[in-house]
Amino acid sequence: MDNNKIGKFITSRRKEKGLTQQELGDRLFVTDKAVSKWERGLSLPDITLLEKLAIQLDVDVSEILCGEQGKKEKI
């Protein structure tokens, strides 16, 4: 997994959905700082958040882990 690629993907999908980091964080019950760290590739979302994040971004968990839409990584 490439943290930077995943972060860019999260950023792209969040912006496509018209959400701020604060709004996405509020929906996931995390801080905007946590979302910022994911997007900058400094950390990854906790495994317990992946499904909720995927729902908010309207993608599959595997697409988040690949950092690309339409790509499926075997989990």
Question: Where do the protein language model's features map onto the residues?
Answer:
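A short, Lys/Arg-rich alpha-helix, primarily the initiator
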Residues: 1-16
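Short, conserved catalytic or interaction motifs in soluble domains
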Residues: 40
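DNA major-groove recognition helix of helix-turn-helix/homeodomain DNA-binding modules
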Residues: 48-63
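Short, charged recognition helix plus adjacent turn
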Residues: 65-75
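Short alpha-helical DNA-recognition segment
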Residues: 18-37, 52
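Short coil turns linking two alpha-helices in DNA-binding domains
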Residues: 2, 20, 31-34, 46, ...
